[in-house]
Amino acid sequence: MSFKGTTVIAIKKNGKTVVAADGQVTFGHTVLKSNAIKIRKLLNGKILAGFAGSTSDAITLFEKFEEKIKAKGDGLIDIKRAAVDLAKDWRSDKILHKLEAMMLVADSNNILLISGTGDVVEPEEDVISIGSGGNYAYSAALAYMENKKLSAFEVALRSLKIAARVCIYTNSNIVLEEIENE
């Protein structure tokens, strides 16, 4: 799956987790909006989520993801279990299967990529990125992560700025959300 029109990155560093995205929305070769918000706080700010792809599909998936977490009913938040459950439904459900988006979700301990092909990926490094500029942002973030002085916020911001310079579907109107790690 390849989605043009965005870059989303998740980073965990020095006790903080950040999810950030650019604001560009494109339709074909036209920029429709430059300040869209593609990240959300879920469960009263305990989980961060970002998406690449169709906005309405992503909102549906955010809602389904929250339902999966709440379905446990024990008050514990297990984003890994919820991600696997969502990926299974997304792949097998006739309606969900048609949704075109990818998601990054993060809590204070985990960063995950969830796709409609049934993939749930926990990155080897504390960095993962999706969207048309994802590879550029990911590469930049890996390099910036080596700088001990940079925070997760700064790594995400700088990495997305690099992606915006290289990817025509990514801009530098960046929105970042951050949570403290436990």
UniProtKB/Swiss-Prot annotation:
Catalytic machinery residues: T6
GO MF term (any one): metal ion binding
Keywords for this protein: Allosteric enzyme, Cytoplasm, Hydrolase, Metal-binding, Protease, Sodium, Threonine protease
A Pfam match: Proteasome
Residues that, per the record, bind Na(+): A164, C167, T170
SUPFAM superfamilies from the UniProt entry: N-terminal nucleophile aminohydrolases (Ntn hydrolases) (SSF56235)
Entry's family note: Belongs to the peptidase T1B family. HslV subfamily.
Record text on subunit structure and interactions: A double ring-shaped homohexamer of HslV is capped on each side by a ring-shaped HslU homohexamer. The assembly of the HslU/HslV complex is dependent on binding of ATP.
Protein name: ATP-dependent protease subunit HslV
Organism: Borreliella burgdorferi (strain ATCC 35210 / DSM 4680 / CIP 102532 / B31) (Borrelia burgdorferi)
Gene that produces this protein: hslV
